């Protein structure tokens, strides 16, 4: 009897996770609000008291976070552009993504990580651009230092990523820290993985000073890489995400399949398998793939066979304006003609049942 009971206790926290209704990060809705601090803070639904406090105290930081939402959602959509679930957002939903993130899936893990990374990136960039009263360039990067190439002087404006990480942790994690359930711990883990991903690509840039461009003196600073690098890295982590269950005391994770390694702080973790996203499903938050463009010659996730879930596809002939007959003219211009190009566009058929058309 002990073994079955032990199994029940191991899975009980996961069952409780599935029944947890409030898992969305309502601060994501900040991209749809604007204006003065009080107006914005009081009109974002679902913020906890700590988040509202930070919102009122740092209106300039909140504006940076709000602008950053558009950037990280665009990056999410870029990474999922060839998949059945394409990180589509719902403008009228305060959770931004609807019910799809109620499931503790790989997709949820990625969204929490990329959103947390986006906050770090947006705040750090705003610091360096002098847009925030509470921070500026990294104050620790002063004086002389050494690297593999020799001695250099810290100069310019080093990105103050430590401030960005500190504020992001305080603001983004506030709601999850109030929760004691397994999903909150999952979100906190993936939030941290996202923050660490941005810092991973902090790079040292230098400028040489000397006669004829020689490097007699070097001035260096630390700069964040383009956010695409963070997105690409987290995408790889999404593909290698580790399914976990809560341990018996509810303080950490255990791998669901003992053949896999224990997740590190850099890995993404999830509890539930993803739906197939083939049809519109109100409960799963899936919009389905009916009408999605597919690639007839691909063998990947964007292929018509995979994207359309075996339902087949429709083909339509469309024309578009392109540049053609381009010629180089001395000096120094390339001149092209405008030409009409005809091409076939393939879109996924809808399921035969009319149920797919019901609103999400």
UniProtKB/Swiss-Prot annotation:
**InterPro entries xrefs:** Wnt, Wnt2, Wnt_C, Wnt_CS
Q: Name one GO cellular component term.
A: extracellular space
Q: Which GO terms describe its biological process?
A: atrial cardiac muscle tissue morphogenesis; canonical Wnt signaling pathway; cardiac epithelial to mesenchymal transition; cardiac muscle cell proliferation; cell fate commitment; cell proliferation in midbrain; cell-cell signaling; cellular response to transforming growth factor beta stimulus
Query: Which cysteine pairs are joined by S-S bonds?
Result: 76-87, 127-135, 137-157, 206-220, 208-215, 278-309, 294-304, 308-348, 324-339, 326-336, 331-332
Mind telling me which PROSITE patterns this protein's record contains? WNT1
Glycan attachment points: 295
Q: Which GO terms describe its molecular function?
A: cytokine activity; frizzled binding
Per UniProt, which keywords does this protein have?
Developmental protein, Disulfide bond, Extracellular matrix, Glycoprotein, Lipoprotein, Secreted, Signal, Wnt signaling pathway
Q: What does the entry's PTM section describe?
A: Palmitoleoylation is required for efficient binding to frizzled receptors. Depalmitoleoylation leads to Wnt signaling pathway inhibition.
Locate the transmembrane regions by residue number: none
Lipid modification (O-palmitoleoyl serine), residues: 212
Query: Which first-to-last residue range defines the signal peptide?
Result: 1-25
Annotated localization:
Secreted, Extracellular space, Extracellular matrix; Secreted
What does the protein in this record do?
Ligand for members of the frizzled family of seven transmembrane receptors. Functions in the canonical Wnt signaling pathway that results in activation of transcription factors of the TCF/LEF family. Functions as a upstream regulator of FGF10 expression. Plays an important role in embryonic lung development. May contribute to embryonic brain development by regulating the proliferation of dopaminergic precursors and neurons.
> What family name appears in the similarity comment?
Belongs to the Wnt family.
State what protein this is by name.
Protein Wnt-2
What is this protein's gene name?
Answer: WNT2
